């Protein structure tokens, strides 16, 4: 496996100027109502629940303070239920986020801290290198990732 110094690569990369923001991620689920109950139990906002006949249904939900939502439903993805893994949720305090999810009845792994690879800019605390995993009822995997300070270049200027 090879690695690239991202700070060198990004300094020479031509960055796009068109404003593009990730809006929605589609989750494959087997039971729409069960998934809706699960994500509501996490405290996620229900944005829409739209049915078109008996063949199509779309539910949109948004995690607290997130600019990106999730879609799931019936009749609009060929992905196998539970096939998405490593969907990241950035949190400022991973221990508090983990405790909140456990209090809501979610099975969450212990917090795992990864060593900081050499060559990355230093950020305080465990930013980017502390994780905890949980799964929805279909097995789609979510990673809590603690980020208290963004790495240089990770903030877009308005």
Question: Could you tell me what each predicted segment is?
Answer:
Residues 29-30, 64-66, 91-94, 137-139, ...:
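Short loop segments at secondary-structure junctions
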Residues 1-18, 50, 59, 89, ...:
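Vicinal oxygen chelate
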Residues 63, 72-74, 146:
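Residue-level recognition of conserved beta-strand positions in structured domain cores
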Residues 73-96:
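Helix-adjacent hinge/juxtasegments
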Residues 19-24, 82-86, 129:
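Short, solvent-exposed beta-strand edge segments and adjacent coil->beta transition regions
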Residues 16-20, 26-68, 96, 103:
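Core segments of cupin and vicinal oxygen chelate
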Residues 63-65, 76, 112:
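Short, small-residue-rich loop/turn micro-motifs
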Residues 68-70, 142:
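Short beta-strand segments
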